[in-house]
Amino acid sequence: IEGIENLNTEKVTNMALMFASCSDLTSLDVTKFNTANVTTLMSMFSNCSSLKSLDVTNFDTRNVTNMFYMFNNCSGLTSLDVTKFNTAKVRNMYSMFMKCSGLKSLDVTNFDTGNVISMAYMFYGCSALTSLDLTNFNTAKVMDMCFMFKKCSGLTSLNLTKFNTAEVTDMSQMFNECSALTTIYASDEFVTTNVETGSNMFFNCIKLKGFIEYNKNTDKENYKYANYKTGYFTKLVGKNGDEKIGATGETLATDNLVLDDDKDFVAYEPFAAKAASYSRTMKEGTAWATLCLPFEVSLQNQNFRAFKLLSADDVTGTVELEEIEGSIAAGTPVIIKMKDGATKLDFTVANKEIAKDVQTAETANGNYQLQGLYTQKEFSKDTDNNCYIVKGSKLMNPAKLLDKTTTESVGSKPFRAYMADNSSAPAAGARMFSISVGGSTTAIEQLESTADSKAEYYDLQGRRLQNLQKGINIVKRGGKTMKVIIK
């Protein structure tokens, strides 16, 4: 269309059907359009199926209330930038992107949908989309979601955790023929209380699995199964690195939780795991380490002993540990001592509760504590001067290590613990922890306050011991003597 860039649209309020069914158009320049007064863009580009590109980034949509069918059947478009759209007043998004089958990506994260009442057919037939971020959608006023995602055959998952469907009356064929869809994340706000019709909602979602699997329940395809307790939805309960953790059932449970030192673990709420695992390989010669896992660990037939911290005194050089019997409670930070040169931790458990938060293990007087970690921690010389770690054979806190040496960073991997001095005047440099240095980040790996090849052990009668024993031990190491009590 020649000269369209010279069209003065300053006073136009209605652009409905403006280019509708211009199916032979391959290009269209609307970058100079003034849309400040436009209230409806209904079907503006509907059935412009030959358009290869369309630039609407300059559209001022602050007054638009209707985007019904706006880009319907623009099947030739592979990309469309609507990130600058102001949709605060829009009430109708019915079929807005329907049959945009060539779109490979679509960013609607900036859409304000607080006033939208219809999202029916909105993404129907967007078969080339492999992902769609709707986490900012406000659906509190939406009444119609029928056919919303029908034939979005490229989508493998949908995160609808922000969807509030209390006003929705029609969910018919909402996910119909989403044949690649494996997971739909939804919260307790996705309800069907007012739904009047919701037939074929999950029809032909052949890979979908929530509490039940579609392929084993093909007769269950209506809105009654739009939940995570008995149906096809999944509740988002946490993240494991970049991976979402989903759980289903009346008692929330995830199928398999595989924890890894390179992945931060965050739980949004307590849940259970049908299977959970964690492993760690330590350097040869490691005697002591720390551990904090979100599931219970049995101590039966393990290659380590586990201890809780009873007391610690930097001034007198006294530490007191008490051996844990039976099991380590979920989320509890502990000190462990490897047996017989073992360097591998390997846990595989079944049907365990997962603790949302790490526990704090304080000494009796509250002056010291073991703080567990589910996530990586980077220590600061300004705010972590009460935390105690060790570099090589020197026992230092992170503040000293960062301030007095060339070390640029000191950190801990997940599923470990560090000691903190909670007293009103923390003593710097408590000789409690040993760490190993690798790469650019120092990672807490061991608790070797007393046990290494250079240490000598004696009982109270002065008799030399081969290893630390239960009771009172006198330990000499590097010109320092300390009393260690192990219960």
Label each PLM-derived region with a short phrase.
Residues 17-21, 42-47, 68-73, 94-99, ...:
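Short beta-strand elements of solenoid repeat domains
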Residues 203-249:
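Extracellular/surface-exposed low-complexity segments
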Residues 1-13, 23-39, 49-65, 75-91, ...:
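Structural signature of tandem-repeat unit edges
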Residues 238-302, 323-394, 406-443, 485-487:
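A short, polar beta-strand/turn micro-motif
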Residues 176, 199-204, 331-338:
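Extracellular/lumenal glycan-associated surfaces
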Residues 102, 182-183, 233, 411, ...:
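Polybasic, low-complexity association/targeting segments
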Residues 299-313:
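Short, surface-exposed polybasic-aromatic patches that bind anionic ligands, especially phosphate groups
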Residues 311, 440-487:
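C-terminal outer-membrane/trafficking sorting elements
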